[in-house]
Amino acid sequence: MKKISLPKIGIRPVIDGRRMGVRESLEEQTMNMAKATAVLITEKIRHACGAQVECVIADTCIAGMAESAACEEKFSSQNVGVTITVTPCWCYGSETIDMDPMRPKAIWGFNGTERPGAVYLAAALAAHSQKGIPAFSIYGHDVQDADDTSIPADVEEKLLRFARAGLAVASMKGKSYLSVGGVSMGIAGSIVDHNFFESWLGMKVQAVDMTELRRRIDQKIYDEAELEMALAWADKNFRYGEDQNASQYKRNEAQNRAVLKESLLMAMCIRDMMQGNKTLAGKGLVEESLGYNAIAAGFQGQRHWTDQYPNGDTAEALLNSSFDWNGVREPFVVATENDSLNGVAMLFGHQLTGTAQIFADVRTYWSPEAVERVTGQALSGLAEHGIIHLINSGSAALDGACKQRDSEGKPTMKPHWEISQQEADACLAATEWCPAIHEYFRGGGYSSRFLTEGGVPFTMTRVNIIKGLGPVLQIAEGWSVELPKAMHDQLDARTNSTWPTTWFAPRLTGKGPFTDVYSVMANWGANHGVLTIGHVGADFITLAAMLRIPVCMHNVEEAKIYRPSAWAAHGMDIEGQDYRACQNYGPLYKR
């Protein structure tokens, strides 16, 4: 089957069409703006898979309807999913704009005095607003000379933020969410909403019963040679933690081996269901070899699977990580308990950063007073106002141990194309695999256990669906926190010390849901959240605006908020604008 091509970014140089000297004097400058934009994007941004982003520039500058149509024909034939229009001069507004209503679009009007690039920008944006096709405005803060070919820092920031978010939109379109199983323990996020995926994300939902996973394992619908490789890799790299089960529930060596084997098979089969595996075609299993074109998935697990079979913790943890027995590779997005809405937040984070995501329960708010009462020690530093315990039964990406290092030697989670094998090994070495607690998981399994290093910037997100309103996005930037060992051990043991832990301190603003740490916990809309490396809330806000998903809670500095220009016409309060604009325009892929 032919591999689906990656979306490209189209660059549209627009120009004043008057000949006899006007257009001729602008051709080179205009096309150079387009070329400089393309160079910036290809040098600074990659697709989530690690591939270099390809930019397609119109064959000629665009002065009117004919050249605009020729540009659109070229873009349509080359899978352009995002467009950036650039100009240093006046052009004819509605005659030159990109009219595709589904495609994220921005306009960069050069801030110069010789020609009125800003005037075109304003005219074109007015046309976009009047026609109901929102566009992003890019206009430099400082005047540049006409022969200045540099891209100012503020313009670069907006170009790259727009490009990252736009590529995320284009990359999700046409893909599927693979729902393996149904609703887990009444969790609302696992009531998979087809309309949300179709109307807001342009995706389909592929619903598959968990018996399909059972069939693939039992009938050996997998690469048997790869299974042996995976087992050998686990034997070399897995450190096993304490078995806290009562003696009557402990498994013997042979039983533990069977649990490990099935856990690895679950990872292989879920992966094959998502993306396909040509090896299966060689076994005569052509249908199964195709997969479901899934860019994200969820596994119900509890309880209809886990009451008799190994849980999904090992499979999910390995799939969500940036490495496995095949080496370093792009992480998958697999939501525990089939929480599709947390899966979407994971998908957003991965598409924006190329990194693995930490899926977690937003489990406990620990006030400074409660910590001191329980441990006899006081919280300090980033944790001084209290902390949130982010912990799940072991499905978080192993990258979350933060044993990778940035250019300054600080702990982080890197895009997978920057991760060395040594860093992958360090994450594995920091992880213990603990036998699943029988009371929760009667079928057994292994939960990964690690502790996230402290002082690492993170952005916590969550998508929720509100009846009568639709989807909303929550964002909380903050940091992981490293507690004194004795304090950590006492607090961790009160929940479950066989699961991975991140102690999280959100950045407080003193207002609304960020008045204090308790308020962040109290305003969180569901039991799950996602951690994405870095303070990247501004990118999430831009992406949400493209999809028409309002942001109901965030602590991002106002100067970093970047939404389409038409949002400004929807009132004077910036967050109210977001709600009114999203309601006015409706989901990107209206149904």
Curated annotation (Swiss-Prot):
The lineage of its organism: Bacteria, Pseudomonadati, Pseudomonadota, Gammaproteobacteria, Enterobacterales. Its EC number is 5.3.1.25. The gene is fucI. GO terms for cellular component: cytoplasm. It comes from Salmonella heidelberg (strain SL476). Mn(2+) binds at residues 337, 361, 528. Converts the aldose L-fucose into the corresponding ketose L-fuculose. GO terms for molecular function: arabinose isomerase activity; L-fucose isomerase activity; manganese ion binding. It catalyses: L-fucose = L-fuculose. InterPro entries: Fuc/Ara_isomerase_C, Fuc_iso_dom3_sf, Fuc_isomerase_C, Fucose_iso_dom1_sf, Fucose_iso_N1, Fucose_isomerase, Fucose_isomerase_dom2_sf, Fucose_isomerase_N/cen_sf. It is an enzyme of class 5 (isomerase). Homohexamer. Belongs to the L-fucose isomerase family. GO terms for biological process: D-arabinose catabolic process; L-fucose catabolic process. This is L-fucose isomerase. Its cofactor is Mn(2+). The keyword Plastid does not apply. Keywords: Carbohydrate metabolism, Cytoplasm, Fucose metabolism, Isomerase, Manganese, Metal-binding. It is found in: Cytoplasm. Pathway: Carbohydrate degradation; L-fucose degradation; L-lactaldehyde and glycerone phosphate from L-fucose: step 1/3. Pfam families: Fucose_iso_C, Fucose_iso_N1, Fucose_iso_N2. The active site is at residues 337, 361.
